[in-house]
A protein has these predicted regions:
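Short, hydrophobic/amphipathic alpha-helical patches that form generic packing surfaces
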Residues: 26-30, 74-82, 111-118, 143-147
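Long, His/Glu/Asp-enriched segments that create or flank divalent metal/ion-associated functional microenvironments
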Residues: 28-107, 137
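Amphipathic alpha-helical substructures
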Residues: 1-37, 92-108, 115, 122, ...
């Protein structure tokens, strides 16, 4: 199937000429970016998470966040909406309330550990070490090492962990992380 064949099929079997124009098939199929006639999507679940983020950013305690039934996607939305810089006490409150440093969900833990690295939240570093030495997926480990490599303290930590974890990683991950850390095997 090609784009041309798909458009021809749509014109022949699915849509009237008026619908083809209204839908703007040409733009959807052949133009870059999002078409002008896209229908905005509203997620009630994410709106509820956004409300919790707003309350937390205003100083509300983590215990006030109603997250018991959140899915992984809601957690990722929440963590992604947090500010870049967060005070250690606020991080500790989130971590204590939701055990984010040891969540057991790789997606959530990865997002949390990136926040912990960015804010030098040391209570999460044992969990970071465990994550990097037990989780080999490049999509998780490479960004964490890259985040660590942005600071002197992080680079030292990354090298220490990587020296131990490197033999367990897939060769593609090793190639990526070697470049990120400037690994030469002697460190």
């Amino acid at each position: 199937m090609t784009s041309d064949r798909m458009v021809a099929y749509m014109k022949q079997k699915l849509f009237t000429p008026e619908e083809v124009q209204k839908i703007n098939v040409q733009e959807w199929v052949y133009q870059p970016g999002v078409p002008a006639n896209i229908v905005p999507v509203h997620s009630a679940a994410f709106a509820a998470v956004d409300s919790q983020v707003t309350t937390w950013k205003a100083g509300g305690p983590a215990s006030g966040i109603h997250a018991a039934k959140w899915s992984t996607h809601e957690w990722l939305h929440f963590l992604g909406a947090l500010p870049d810089t967060i005070a250690e006490a606020r991080l500790a409150d989130l971590d204590k309330t939701f055990r984010l440093s040891s969540s057991g969900n790789s997606e959530i833990e990865f997002a949390w550990l990136r926040i912990a690295i960015r804010n030098h939240y040391t209570p999460a570093f044992a969990g970071l070490d465990h994550f990097l030495t037990s989780q080999g997926r490049r999509k998780f480990v490479a960004p964490l090492y890259a985040d660590l490599a942005k600071t002197d303290w992080g680079k030292r930590m990354a090298m220490d962990i990587y020296k131990r974890a490197r033999p367990t990683y897939h060769s593609v991950a090793v190639g990526t992380i070697d470049k990120s850390l400037g690994w030469n095997g002697a460190k």
